[in-house]
Amino acid sequence: MMQESGSEAKSNGSTIQNGSSGGNHLLECGTLRDTRSNGEAPAVDLGAADLAHVQQQQQQALQVARQLLLQQQQQQQQQQQQQQQQQQQQQQQQQQQQQQQQQQQQQQQVSGLKSPKRNDKQPALQVPVSVAMMTPQVITPQQMQQILQQQVLSPQQLQVLLQQQQALMLQQQQLQEFYKKQQEQLQLQLLQQQHAGKQPKEQQQQQVATQQLAFQQQLLQMQQLQQQHLLSLQRQGLLTIQPGQPALPLQPLAQGMIPTELQQLWKEVTSAHTAEETTGSNHSSLDLTSTCVSSSAPSKTSLIMNPHASTNGQLSVHTPKRESLSHEEHPHSHPLYGHGVCKWPGCEAVCDDFPAFLKHLNSEHALDDRSTAQCRVQMQVVQQLELQLAKDKERLQAMMTHLHVKSTEPKAAPQPLNLVSSVTLSKSASEASPQSLPHTPTTPTAPLTPVTQGPSVITTTSMHTVGPIRRRYSDKYNVPISSADIAQNQEFYKNAEVRPPFTYASLIRQAILESPEKQLTLNEIYNWFTRMFAYFRRNAATWKNAVRHNLSLHKCFVRVENVKGAVWTVDEVEFQKRRPQKISGNPSLIKNMQSGHAYCTPLNAALQASMAENSIPLYTTASMGNPTLGSLASAIREELNGAMEHTNSNESDSSPGRSPMQAVHPIHVKEEPLDPEEAEGPLSLVTTANHSPDFDHDRDYEDEPVNEDME
C-alpha cells in the first residue's frame, strides 16, 4: 500500500511539474509526497485548489504570450511604414535633383547665348546669330497653295512683294558675307594674340567684347530693318497674321523663296486675273480693294485682305503704290488709329504709341467670329449709306434735269427749289442743247452780268407778306425708322460709336413708342438715347440740346402734365403730316422755268460761290480751279438779288413773245445752317420769298425758341 501511494504521488508530482510555471508547485508536491510517505491519508481538497490555481496561471501565461505577439506585429508594421517613407523621400530627392539639373542646363544654354565663352584655347570664337536671319525657311508647294488660298493677291501687289523679297535676300547675303568676314578677322586676331602673348588677358577680352558688341549692334539693325519691312507689308494688306501664328511678324511671308518661283507665281496669277480685268475695268471706281475683282460681286477674301477698304462706312480706293507712299510720308497714320485710341467699332482701347496699336490690332482684332461679325455689321451700315446716297443722286439728277430742260407748259406741282448741285453748265452747252444733260462738270467762264434776256425764275401773282418758307434737311430727307431697323443692329449701336442714320425726331418717337405707357419724361428720353446708342454717351450737351429743340419744334410731340410731372407723347397724325410734302396750290403761282444762258450763269455761279464759302470740298477754290470764285462770293448774291430788280425795271422793254411780269418781288437767297444734330449733312440753299396763305401748312417747319426743359 505504501508503494502504491508513493507511485501515485510520483505521477501527481510529474503532472504538477509539467503544468506549473513556478518553483512553489514543486515544493508543495514535495511536502505532499513527504506527508504521504509518512503514512498520512491524502487530502482531496488541497488537490482541487492546486489544479484551479494552475489553470489560472496557465491562462495568464497565454495572455502574456498573445500580448508579446501583438507587440511584435505592430513593430514590424511600423518598420515597414518607415521604410516606405524613406523610399518616397529618396524619390522626391531624386526628382528635385533632376529638376535642378534641368534648370542648370537651361541657365547654361541661356548664358551661352547671351554671353559666349571667352576662352583663349578655343580655335574659333562663337558669335550668336539669329537662326531666322542666317537660315531662310524654304516654303513647300503645299504652303504655297495655302498662302494662295488664304490671300488672293493682285498682280501689282505680287510685283511689289517680289521687289521687296529680292531686296531682302540681298540684305541677307550681305549679312552672311559680313558675318564670315567678321569671324575670319576674329580668328586672325586670336591667333596673333596667342603667338605674341605680350598683351595681358584683360586687354584681349576687352577688344573681343567691343568687337562682339559692334557685331551684335549690326545684327540688331538688320532685324529692325526686317521688322519695318514687315510692318509696311501689314499696312499695305500684303501680310495677314493668323491668331495661332505669334511668330509670324518676325519673318517675312515669302522668306526663302527663289526669285524665279516668285516670278512664275506672279505670271500664273496675272494670267488668272486677265479675264477679271476686262469685266472689272468698267467698275473700277466701286472696287473696294483696288484690284481687278469686279464690283458687282466682291469676294470676302478681298475685304479681309485690305483692311483699309471700308472703315466706319467710308470707302477709300487706293492703289498699293499710293498707299505705300502715304505710309512712308506718315508712318503712324492708320484709319483705325487716331489720337492714341483704337478706332475699331466698339473697341476704343488706349494705345500709347503706334507699335502698341499694331500689337493690339493683331492680338485683339484677329480673324475670329467676333471680328467677322463686326465686319458684317459695318458692311450693312455701308450698304445702307450707299443706298441712301444712290437715292439722293437720283433726286439730284431729276432736279438738274428739271432745271435745265426747257419747258413749254406750266408745271402743276414742281419740286421745291433745293439748290444743291454738283454739275454746272457752260455757255456753249446751255445754248447748243438745252434739252440734253451735261456730261462733264464745267465752270462758267463768262463774266457775270445782270439778267436782261429773260424773266425771273419764279414769278408770283398777288403774293402777300406772310412769312418765310423753310425747308430743313431733316424734313426733306427724313429717313423712316422702325423697331426692326434698330433691333437688327442693336448690339452694334450699343457698342460702336457710330452715328445712327436716323433723325432726332424719329429716334424720340421710337423711344416714346417703346415705353409701356407710350409717354416719357425728358430724362427718360435721355436715358433711352444713352442706353441704345454708344454715340450719345459723349458730347451730352450738344445732342441733349438738339433733343430739347426737336421736342419744342415739332407739333407731333405733345407735352402733358401728370403726377410725375411733364411727360411727352406722340401725335401720330401730326407726325405723318411732317413727312416730306410737295407744294400744292394754284398752278398760276409758279411760272415756267427758263434754262437760258442768262439764268444758268448767275444761278450756278451763286451756287458755286456759296458752296465755296461753306468749305464744301467739291466747290472749294482749289478744286474748282477758278481763283475768282472766292473773291466774288459776296458780290454774287447782291448781283443775283439785283438782277431781279433789274428785270422788274425793264418790264416794258421785254420782247413781244414774252409776257410781262406782274408784281415781282425780289427773291433773296440766303444760307440756312442746319441744326446742331444735322451738322454732318450737306448745307442747302433755301429761297426765302413772300407767299400766299396757301403755304401756311409749311410754317410748321419754322424754328421756334428752344424751351430748356430740365426735368
Curated annotation (Swiss-Prot):
Biased composition (Acidic residues): 701-711
Residue numbers carrying Phosphoserine: S115, S692
PROSITE patterns found in the cross-reference section: FORK_HEAD_2, FORK_HEAD_3, ZINC_FINGER_C2H2_1
GO terms of biological process kind: cardiac muscle cell differentiation; cellular response to tumor necrosis factor; DNA damage response; endothelial cell activation; forebrain development; heart development; immunoglobulin V(D)J recombination; innate vocalization behavior
Keywords assigned: DNA-binding, Isopeptide bond, Metal-binding, Nucleus, Phosphoprotein, Repressor, Transcription, Transcription regulation, Ubl conjugation, Zinc, Zinc-finger
Coiled coil: none
DNA-binding stretch(es), residue numbering of this chain: 499-589
Superkingdom of the source species: Eukaryota
Low complexity bias (residue ranges): 438-452
Chain positions covered by the region annotation Disordered: 1-41, 273-292, 305-332, 424-456, 645-711
MF (Gene Ontology): chromatin binding; core promoter sequence-specific DNA binding; DNA binding; DNA-binding transcription factor activity; DNA-binding transcription factor activity, RNA polymerase II-specific; DNA-binding transcription repressor activity, RNA polymerase II-specific; identical protein binding; nuclear androgen receptor binding
Annotated spans, Leucine-zipper: 382-403
Segments for region (CTBP1-binding): 416-420
Function: Transcriptional repressor. Can act with CTBP1 to synergistically repress transcription but CTPBP1 is not essential. Plays an important role in the specification and differentiation of lung epithelium. Acts cooperatively with FOXP4 to regulate lung secretory epithelial cell fate and regeneration by restricting the goblet cell lineage program; the function may involve regulation of AGR2. Essential transcriptional regulator of B-cell development. Involved in regulation of cardiac muscle cell proliferation. Involved in the columnar organization of spinal motor neurons.
Location relative to the cell: Nucleus
Biased composition (Basic and acidic residues): 320-332
Biased composition annotated in UniProt, kind: Polar residues: 1-19, 305-317, 424-437, 646-657
Subunit record text: Forms homodimers and heterodimers with FOXP2 and FOXP4. Dimerization is required for DNA-binding. Self-associates. Interacts with CTBP1. Interacts with NCOR2 and AR. Interacts with FOXP2. Interacts with TBR1. Interacts with AURKA; this interaction facilitates the phosphorylation of FOXP1, which suppresses the expression of FBXL7. Interacts with ZMYM2.
Zinc finger (C2H2-type): 340-365
Lineage: Eukaryota, Metazoa, Chordata, Craniata, Vertebrata
Domain remarks: The leucine-zipper is required for dimerization and transcriptional repression.
Modified residues (Phosphothreonine): T687
Gene symbol of the encoding locus: Foxp1
Crosslink feature (Glycyl lysine isopeptide (Lys-Gly) (interchain with G-Cter in SUMO2)) location: K321, K406, K411, K476
Species of origin: Rattus norvegicus
Name assigned to this protein: Forkhead box protein P1
Main location: nucleus
GO cellular component: nucleus
